[in-house]
């Protein structure tokens, strides 16, 4: 009986913990629900997404967005399905810069493939979990042709025939249907003013629709976690100019998949440059990524925006308590020296922080030792924002600040982050290379390694 009681108590405690986490998440998500309500989101669904094991869950999550008042436009492609059809017919696929040449005799078959995928999306919103979100009225999905297409023409000497591009968006029709509380679905098939049928690129269509509607968000569902840096780490925030650099790097690849992803980044940046508030690049290969990106502060993909949601700014007196909470776990592990709140308040002018919607998620400090030498210290990032490039961003900012102040060299002391500093072009040096007054402050018990870098 005793064992049963202990097991029961443990189960109750575990249940309470899970319930508490769910309640906390829901409470924290309320501000996002309120901010998203009434906004227009354009969602890009690659053809590959249809084969994801989480496609049903994605449709349910889109229905959830619709149920809280988000105005949704879905744009889907059909690249892999079309490729499979070519392979079955033993037909050669001609590519140029990741674009497919669509022959006149093939466009009817392609239209049929695309129509089947559109019907699949339509059916999924009428069944399963998606349908249960609004049992009274259901989700009214409108499959339409909300654009006028034109031929892509001849590029690099290649006639793309029935491969097209957007001529203009029928924005009034889109707005009318959105005002009628409809969920809109646009495929990658478009028609010209003369009635010709064209095969278009879904990311181009989505971008032009998002710009025309002045959408709050464009969300690109793709098969990777987002944009990565040269070391392969996820970059969770980019401005449009930085995005364009990443796009150029990816598009220079001879691999078709990387070139295509570069194109997605390029269009995502264009959307922001032309008035869309934010674009998100997230992975459809994991469950719940859309919800995590839109309803949590840490997100899970790459956000492209002119308005930096993770603001890098000078430290303020009011930040001292949050900085203390941020660095305390590192102090307890012996990775940072102990600092009091009073000390942080007195040194706050030396700090730079990354402020994510009112929460300090990373910090670092710069101290000038001489006219030409400065120390960077107290680099810390919260656990849930690790591996997102925040430390590198702070380091770059402090390096620029030091350079502007006439500093020619910066140094750091570290017990465990030696490799990270080496990756960022620091070189190990001796204690004797530091000024005498700084040598006297060296902790002989911690025995930190010293690294230096020219700026």
PLM features: residue spans?
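Nucleotide/pyrophosphate-binding catalytic subdomain
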Residues: 1-278, 313, 317-325, 355, ...
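Conserved GNAT acetyl-CoA-binding A-motif
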Residues: 400-415
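A short, internal acetyl-CoA/4′-phosphopantetheine-binding micro-motif in the GNAT/acyltransferase core
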Residues: 379-386, 416
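A conserved beta-strand-loop-helix scaffold within acyl/acetyltransferase catalytic domains
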Residues: 338-382
